Structures are given as structure tokens and as C-alpha cells.
Amino acid sequence: MHRKTLAELAAGLERREFSSVELTQAHLARIERLDPALNSFITTTPEIALAQARAADERLAKGEAGPLTGIPIAQKDIFCTKGVRTSCGSRMLDSFVSPYDACVVERFNAAGAVMLGKLNMDEFAMGSSNETSYYGPVKNPWNTATVPGGSSGGSAAAVAARLVPGATGTDTGGSIRQPAAFCGITGLKPTYGRVSRWGMIAFASSLDQAGPMARTAEDCAIMLQIMAGFDERDSTCVDRPVPDYRAALGNDLDGLRIGLPKEFFGEGLDPAIAGLIHAAVDEYRRLGAIVREISLPNMHLSVPAYYVVAPAECSSNLARFDGVRFGHRCENPTDLADLYTRSRGEGFGAEVKRRILIGTYALSAGYYDAYYLKAQKIRRLISEDFRRAFEEVDVIMGPTAPSVAFEFGAKSADPIAMYLSDIYTIAVNLAGLPGMSIPVGFSNGLPVGMQIIGGYFSEDRLLNVAHRYQQATDWHTRTPAGIAD
């Protein structure tokens, strides 16, 4: 059953070829057998999953099934789950059990999905390799000596290893798209405000966005249909009708205008990846698309601007973790200052501390104008670059990452090298645009992803563009060795 896509599993359940309980038991057994070598899960929830599966079977028997009824999924451990630990990959929240469900979790529960557990991630979603997790690194199923990407590395690895047909992720600067590329799956970051952030532990509030991760664009469309929509509890969530994403998958691509930014194909990009991206674009030409070169002149400023804005917001958001109300608390503090200092010092890892330090510095008196204000001005310039580009083209394509998955430790000693792993994805977050990554081939036995970027609220178009490519190719069907059995 693990060979089937989410859409195929839903069809099988509807035809009563198997029950949700059988499907859930099969995936739980697979997690128990394979995940010790991958470490993609922080917490598994077999009792909850089987109870949800039994309830789903009852709904299926009554003919009350929805598109996700009885389908196993897993949640990134950044989403609050009532009665289940929500750690955010940090020692700070190692013992935190949320009293409520995040909006995304509520919506999957209401749709009848089955939650298998909570997935590993970089601490507080800060990282590009899943090496910053308090619970240890996640291994890439294609080569366990390499990283799965981050911060949604557990989600990407679990889907790639067929431990779960679909998983949630979050994307602040590439944290859905980059791990999707490294693990050879499909991942979508929606437009900022398309999916509620209520109950999603905040990293950078003006950048964070939740999205689906699965094997195919069709599966992502099914998941996004559940996730998207207005939520009055999130002031940044947009009150806008949600289209039928799956219905849009049948549209042809004749006359689709594709833009290739020249800035995406310069120094630093692995030539093998560039070749695979151009080969994928050639496939789109055969499908009727028109391709032209475009320019995003301020792209080179996206990484430095991001690493002012995101740490500044992180510094503010993580101030709430003080050892008083919840989270890690040091033993025997001598006074309040000691409680704060030791609790935060013990609870946060090195990368989180680095970003808090950067952000606090950027917001401090005398430096605010020089750093934070300037970064926000650059952010506007980047948004304007995209606006002008989308007057000429319908979608933008390019590499998701400059390299394939790298080995553990290869970049951990050099933060700048690590940050540059997201050089092609960060600008999309700064502008609040939707973007996705789809697999387009392999280099040195490791998957390569292509990024597709669209205008605001064009997720239906992106999903269709990705789906048509996946109808014409089979890269998304490839499975890591030792995982297919």
C-alpha cells in the first residue's frame, strides 16, 4: 500500500479495497521498521492514529467520505497538537504538551485524516539541513550520509521513504521547497496568508507559511484544499475564496509564458543542476509553453535582507520562552535574571542563539535604520522585481537549490555557506509569493528539484503546471534503494 500515492489510496478506500485501519497499521509498521535509520519522526501516535482510522472506516461505511478520510498523514512538529508533545525540535519545548490544536491540525482532523505522529525538524525551523534538531539529524533516504534539507527535513524524508503519503511543512525561507528538492518529492509554499498560522509556533511572522509535502502535485492539491482558507484567529490570514485545486489540474499549457531569471543561473550553481533544469524547461516547450529570459535585478540582496528581517522577528517571537510560563526551566535559579539566562541558555541550541543575537542587534538603538529598515526597503524592491516580471510571464522557473544534498557536517561550521543553500528560495518568502519544488532528475544519485514561482494566489496554476510535467515524466515516481520493498 505504501507504493500508492495519496490520491490512489483515497480511491482504494472509497472502493473498499482495504480499510483505513489496515492502511494505518501498514504505515505504522513501516515507520517502526525503517525510521530508526532515518529519524524522521520525533513522536509517533499509534493509539490516536488507530482511533482516527476506526472513526474514518465508520464514515466510509456510511458514504460520508471526503478526499482525505482515512488517509494517514504526519504533522511537522511545529504545529500544536492537543494532548501530544509539540517540541519544535528544541530542548526548550521538550516537555510541552499543547492544550489545543493548530488550525491546520483542526482542518485535517475535520477532514477525517489519520495522524501518524510529529515529524523532526530544525530547531524552531531555523536551519537548512535538519542538523540543528535537539532530537538528532534526519537522514536522507537517498543517501543516509547526506542531509534531507531543512527545516522540514523530517517531513521530506518521511514522504520520500514512503513512511507516509503526505506531510505538512512550513516555509520561512525555503523550508518546504529545499528539503523537497533534496529528497525528490513535491512541496508547495502557498501565498503568504493563504493558510492560517494559528497554532503554528512562530519563527518569523511576516515570512512563515504552512504548506503540503507529498509525492505528486495532485496529492499536494488535495492537501492544500484542506489547509487553505480564512481563519479569523490569524490576523494575517486572507479572506479569499479557495478554488478547487484538483479541478485545475486538467488545464493544458499551450501559450504558458515561462520566465527564466538570468540571476538563477550564475556563479554558484552546480552545472549538472543547470542542465537538468534546462531539460525540464525543454519538456515544457514540448507541452506548448513559451520560454523567455527575464531579470530579477535585486535577487543578490535577498539573502542579506532575509538574515536581518527573519532574525529580528525571531528575536521578538522567541522572547516568550523564558522558563516561567512554559518551556524548559533551569534548576535552582538564584534570582529572576538567573532564571532567564540559564533557562534560555540551556533550552536553545547554537543556531537559534545565533539568530536571536543577530536579530536583537539589528533592532537595537542606533542600528535599526542601518539594518532592519534598510532590509525592509530591499524587501520592497524584490517584491517590485517580481511584480514587473509577472507582467511579462505567467510562471518563473529555476533551480530550487544550488547543489544536491550535501554530507552531514559539510556546512555546519560555516553559517554563510549554509544560508546560501536557500539562495533561490528566500526571495519568494520576502515577496510573499507561492512557490513549489518538483523533482526533475538526479545528479550523483541524488534528486534535483526545480522551483516554480507564481503570482499571488496562483497555487492552482502552479499545481497544474507541476502536474502536467509529472504526467509527462516519471521522476516523481522514483524510490530510494531499500525503501520500495
UniProtKB/Swiss-Prot annotation:
> Any keyword Nucleotide-binding?
yes
Q: Can you name one GO molecular function term for this protein?
A: glutaminyl-tRNA synthase (glutamine-hydrolyzing) activity
Q: Which HAMAP family match?
A: GatA
Chain's role: Allows the formation of correctly charged Gln-tRNA(Gln) through the transamidation of misacylated Glu-tRNA(Gln) in organisms which lack glutaminyl-tRNA synthetase. The reaction takes place in the presence of glutamine and ATP through an activated gamma-phospho-Glu-tRNA(Gln).
GO cellular component term, pick one: glutamyl-tRNA(Gln) amidotransferase complex
Please name the top-level EC class of this enzyme. ligase
- What SUPFAM superfamilies does its record include? Amidase signature (AS) enzymes
Q: What is its EC number?
A: 6.3.5.7
List, from the UniProt record, the residues annotated as the active site of this protein.
76, 151, 175
- Protein name listed in UniProt: Glutamyl-tRNA(Gln) amidotransferase subunit A
Catalyzed chemical reaction(s): L-glutamyl-tRNA(Gln) + L-glutamine + ATP + H2O = L-glutaminyl-tRNA(Gln) + L-glutamate + ADP + phosphate + H(+)
| Single GO biological process annotation from the record | translation
Pfam families tied to this protein: Amidase
Q: Which NCBIfam families match?
A: gatA
Instruction: Please name the PROSITE patterns in this protein's record.
Output: AMIDASES (PS00571)
Encoding gene (name): gatA
Matching InterPro entries, A to Z? Amidase, Amidase_CS, Amidase_dom, AS_sf, GatA
What quaternary structure, including any partners, is listed in this protein's UniProt entry? Heterotrimer of A, B and C subunits.
- Keyword Protein biosynthesis applies: yes
Protein family per UniProt:
Belongs to the amidase family. GatA subfamily.
This protein's UniProt keywords = ATP-binding, Ligase, Nucleotide-binding, Protein biosynthesis
